[in-house]
C-alpha cells in the first residue's frame, strides 16, 4: 500500500477537506507530472475512512481508467469490495440507469471536460454527492469557466515553482507554424522511418 504523499500533495489534501466543510463541489488544479492521480487515490482512501461509503471515479479515456484503477489498487482499494468504482464517462452514460447505488463522492479526472452534457448530468442526478474535479488546466479554450459546477478552485504551485523546487524538470517549448516545412517534416515520417517500424 502506497500512502506516502509529497509535502505539496499533503497540503492539497488538507486544503481540499477543509474546503469541503464549506462547499460540496471543489476543483483541484495541479500541473501535469505532479502526482494528481496519486493524490486522488489518497483523497478517496481518506474519504472512505470517514463518512463516505461509495466513490465513483470518472475519466474520459480508457487509458486513464486503467491508470486510476492501478493507482487506487496500490493504495489498498480494490474494485472487488464495491466501494470504489472507476469508469469512463461513456460507460457511465450508457449504464447509469442500471446502477442501483448512489455515490457519496464523484471524482472527475481531467475535470476541464466537465462542462460536457454527459458530465453535467452527474450534478443533476446526484446533487447530494460531493464532487472533486482534478485537472492541470482549469480553463477551456471556449473561454467558459466552471463556476456553475465547482464552487471552489484549489490551485497548487505554478509550473515554475515546481521546477524551482526540483519536483519537475525544466523544459524547452518549441512552436512550429502550421503548414510550415518544419511541421510537414515533423508530422510526415520519412521512408527510412517507416522501414524501421
Q: At which residue positions do the language-model features occur?
A:
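Walker A/P-loop
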Residues: 23-42
Amino acid at each position: 500500500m502506497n500512502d506516502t504523499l509529497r509535502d505539496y500533495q499533503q497540503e492539497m489534501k488538507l486544503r481540499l477537506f477543509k474546503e469541503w466543510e464549506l462547499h460540496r463541489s471543489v476543483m483541484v488544479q495541479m500541473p501535469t507530472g505532479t502526482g494528481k492521480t496519486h493524490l486522488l487515490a489518497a483523497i478517496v482512501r481518506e474519504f472512505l475512512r470517514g463518512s463516505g461509503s461509495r466513490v465513483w471515479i470518472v475519466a474520459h479515456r480508457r487509458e486513464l481508467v486503467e491508470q486510476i484503477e492501478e493507482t487506487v489498487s496500490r493504495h489498498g482499494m480494490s474494485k472487488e469490495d464495491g466501494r470504489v468504482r472507476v469508469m469512463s464517462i461513456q460507460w457511465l452514460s450508457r449504464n447509469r440507469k442500471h446502477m442501483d447505488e448512489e455515490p457519496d463522492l464523484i471524482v472527475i479526472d481531467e475535470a476541464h471536460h466537465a462542462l460536457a452534457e454527459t458530465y453535467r448530468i452527474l450534478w443533476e442526478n446526484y446533487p447530494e454527492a460531493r464532487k472533486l474535479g482534478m485537472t492541470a488546466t482549469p480553463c477551456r479554450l471556449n473561454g467558459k469557466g466552471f463556476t456553475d459546477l465547482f464552487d471552489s478552485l484549489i490551485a497548487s504551485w505554478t509550473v515554475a515553482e515546481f521546477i524551482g523546487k526540483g519536483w519537475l524538470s525544466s523544459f524547452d517549448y518549441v512552436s512550429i507554424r502550421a503548414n510550415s516545412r518544419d511541421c510537414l517534416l515533423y508530422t510526415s515520417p520519412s521512408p527510412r522511418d517507416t522501414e524501421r517500424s
